[in-house]
Amino acid sequence: MSDLSTHFPDYLAGYRETPCPFWSGNSAPRPLQSSTITPPPTQPRQWQERPYFCDNLARLCEENLGGRVSDITFPGGSDRSACLVRWEDGRTAIASFRGETGRARLEERVLHHLNQYAAPVPNVLFFNGIVMLQETLVGERLSTLLANADAPARHTVLASALSSLHQIHLAAAQAGIDQAVPVIGGEEDWIARHIRQLRKIGDAFEIPVPALDKASLQDILLPLKPRLVKWDARPGNAMVDATGKVSWFDWEHCGARNRLDDLVWLLCDESVPFCSATEQALLTEFVPLFADGAPLEVAHRYAAVAGVLHCTARLGLILHKQQGEEGWWDRQEILDYDYIGVTLPQAQQLCARAADWASREPLVVSLVPWFADVAGHIETL
């Protein structure tokens, strides 16, 4: 296999060349101020990781939310941009800090407005333009639940996850923020590059991609009715509580596009075990809810095309990581730290899913045997 580049960072960002303003609403973020300022600790605290960062963050939390911080941990690893803060009085919060202040402001504003309409997202406790503290969502990651569930249980929890995304879409419309967030994936070059990932994988394995009507694919993917979408709606970004309620966190990549994109991001992730019957049933049930007024035939065509290309994007990212890291990754570590699914079964399952979704749409049905060939070549890596 020759070197394989991935366009996934641009795909996730939602633009190729021209970054757009992250929030066009009028209201500005304001930090919450605690009425009681906690005096500094009399003795230095001992932190397990990143002591200087933890000292500063603990002081910030205490100044604005009161109480005494007893512990700060990094469940996803110390290289991640989020950590868990614990107070002596039992309170907890998730602290996140984004490299791009525009994305931080976007995330805070979207969560603020969605919370006004009881959407299943965390409540913001504090924000100062860089650091955001939000409520801790109790439960288990959706990706972990899916890995350990049988087919009926997977159908149930995926249906709950799709219902919660639909609830978020409705809340965004009520809040009037569809036009306040940036349009993502609207550049023609961005869409063309997304489609080209097929050729990159084909070139890497020396398996020519069948001829496709790229102009029609491009037209299908143009977001002509942009609405708020989470966009990065991976199962790893959802928490399921004891009642089965699914809540969504990590909103820095949200924007305005086709609501069906959230359905695609969820169902076409490599952490979702492939089951054609389950996915067909979910598409039948939820495509009408995510269609946003489009005729069902048009909505199903969009879902099929976007789903095939999303599987391709995830596959390209996985193969790029596999080559760069010189091998497949540990499955349990992937689940524990919400890493990309760089395993042979997950890569091949993306091929199976892409072929299955392609079989439903004439514009991409020629890719069915091609994905089977790719899956066979992946076996040799």
Regions found by a protein language model. Name each.
Residues 3, 7-11, 26:
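Intrinsic-disorder-associated, low-complexity terminal segments enriched in Asp/Asn/His/Tyr and depleted
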Residues 8, 15, 20, 36-71:
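Juxta-kinase regulatory segment immediately upstream of eukaryotic protein kinase catalytic domains
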Residues 150-151, 247, 264-266:
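Glycine-rich, phosphate-binding/catalytic loops in enzymes
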Residues 150-205, 226, 255, 329-330:
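A cross-family kinase active-site recognition segment
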Residues 260-295, 306-328:
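Active-site activation/catalytic loop segments of kinase-like enzymes and analogous catalytic loops
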Residues 312-381:
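ATP/Mg2+ or Mg2+-diphosphate-binding catalytic cores
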